[in-house]
């Protein structure tokens, strides 16, 4: 299961705001610290947190005060670039979902930092709204007991 999200950098508050694709524009954005790219521990994420928001398909960590599992976010545009031409990232995320050894956390952090922030910080793009894919998060099973294809819209 994966969820498609709008991702908007709010530089004034230094947060990354997330909202499900198709949500009303006046909906409450989800946010997490921009600088925190490590996954919160499962114990730091209460299982009932955010249940009242009814955003089906989003993992419980999306509502955590510690922020979402930022390591699981990547630009949908980057999914088929030369960086990921041989489908390494989906395999790595899937292995991590299963608890198998995969790419090191340091390498993943560097990859995601590049994907998420390169266009905004280095290329100076005016449009700061991107579509991102959330996949492989270990918290996803809390909100989505049903099975569906990896990297598809929720």
Swiss-Prot record:
- Quick one: where's region Mitochondrial targeting sequence? 68-117
Q: Which GO terms describe its cellular component?
A: host cell mitochondrion; host cell nucleus
Kindly provide the PTM information from the record.
A fraction may be phosphorylated in insect cells and HepG2 cells, a human hepatoblastoma cell line. Phosphorylated in vitro by host protein kinase C or mitogen-activated protein kinase. N-acetylated in insect cells.
Gene source species: Hepatitis B virus genotype A3 (isolate Cameroon/CMR711/1994) (HBV-A)
GO biological process: any one?
symbiont-mediated activation of host NF-kappaB cascade
Its taxonomic path starts at: Viruses, Riboviria, Pararnavirae, Artverviricota, Revtraviricetes
Q: What does this protein do?
A: Multifunctional protein that plays a role in silencing host antiviral defenses and promoting viral transcription. Does not seem to be essential for HBV infection. May be directly involved in development of cirrhosis and liver cancer (hepatocellular carcinoma). Most of cytosolic activities involve modulation of cytosolic calcium. The effect on apoptosis is controversial depending on the cell types in which the studies have been conducted. May induce apoptosis by localizing in mitochondria and causing loss of mitochondrial membrane potential.
Which protein is depicted?
Protein X
Which HAMAP family does the protein's record reference? HBV_X
What is the protein's major site of localization?
host cell
Corresponding gene?
X
């Amino acid at each position: 299961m994966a969820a498609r999200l709008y991702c908007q950098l709010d530089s004034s508050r230094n947060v990354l705001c997330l909202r499900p694709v198709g949500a009303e524009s006046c909906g409450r954005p989800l946010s997490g610290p921009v600088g925190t790219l490590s996954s919160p521990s499962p114990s730091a994420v209460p299982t009932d947190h955010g249940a009242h928001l009814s955003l089906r398909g989003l993992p419980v960590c999306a509502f955590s005060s510690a922020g979402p599992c930022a390591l699981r976010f990547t630009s949908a545009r980057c999914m088929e670039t030369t960086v990921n031409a041989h489908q390494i990232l989906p395999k790595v995320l899937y292995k991590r979902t299963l608890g198998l050894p995969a790419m090191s956390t340091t390498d993943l952090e560097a990859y995601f930092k590049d994907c998420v922030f390169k266009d905004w910080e280095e290329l100076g793009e005016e449009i700061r709204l991107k579509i991102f894919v959330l996949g492989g998060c270990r918290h996803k099973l809390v909100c989505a007991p049903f099975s569906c294809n990896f990297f598809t819209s929720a």
